């Protein structure tokens, strides 16, 4: 899973070099070798792959997967340079990395399954990113607070602003 995740991001940055600048922990990386050896990129790639694996493993539980993708997509709002269309840019690198990982086991049928699956996942992430039921507050101190509007109240925001 770790190898596949790194492969996805190497391919993503190779085809969309400007995207690496969004990531503060590895935006200085320039070569594929640097990317493959970087611990911060490895950590992020593993985190992304864990989320993808969780979504795929639970694909028969629509409510769980929808909630996971909504929360994950929404969490990307805190990155000022991130745009929802960035999710789509991982589609082909994901499919290419899966093909490499599966080798001879990657059939036309598997390609169709993974294409449908990644399209569903990416749409869920984009929907979550655009979810307007979440509020984010960035305090002057630079701390960010995410609150679900249904759970938040005025006291929550006052306490957050005072801290």
List the model feature ranges, each with a label.
Residues 1-163:
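Globin-like tetrapyrrole-binding proteins
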